[in-house]
């Protein structure tokens, strides 16, 4: 089950990325129903020396094989196997700021720090109003 990311109950693949920057996700351990909410970007920026000048390059991330940053979650993936985890995309995001905002919003809404039902152990976000100026809450599922 957990081998592919799901978005609206369908497999999410490279060709569906479009102009999105990243996504907010939830990973569920099907053996004990414990969950993790996080964010992941489709690309990262690397700098490379080209003819004596620094050039920024957009490099694909490891989003297809990613299982979160929680060490406990990663240990459980090794113990139970990836097929016992459901990886679902909750929100596709057009910018880094919107990803950070929606991740924190989901984490606070679900009380991830107050519940033993979540792997999350901390919430870290730095978002300014200007980062989400183009975000329209009504257009996000």
Across the structure, where does each feature detected by a protein language model lie?
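Structure-specific nucleic-acid interaction/processing domains
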Residues: 1-141
């Amino acid at each position: 089950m957990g081998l592919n990311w799901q978005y609206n109950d369908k497999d999410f693949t490279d060709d569906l990325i479009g102009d999105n920057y990243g996504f907010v996700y939830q990973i569920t351990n099907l053996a004990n129903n414990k969950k993790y909410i996080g964010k992941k970007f489709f690309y990262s920026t690397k700098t490379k020396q080209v003819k004596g000048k620094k050039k920024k390059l957009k490099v694909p991330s490891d989003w297809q094989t990613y299982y979160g940053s929680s060490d406990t979650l990663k240990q459980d993936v090794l113990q139970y196997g990836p097929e016992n985890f459901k990886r679902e995309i909750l929100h596709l995001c057009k910018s880094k700021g919107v990803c950070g905002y929606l991740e924190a919003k989901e984490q606070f809404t679900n009380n991830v720090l107050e519940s033993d039902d979540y792997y999350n152990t901390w919430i870290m976000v730095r978002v300014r109003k200007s980062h989400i100026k183009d975000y329209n809450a009504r257009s996000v599922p």
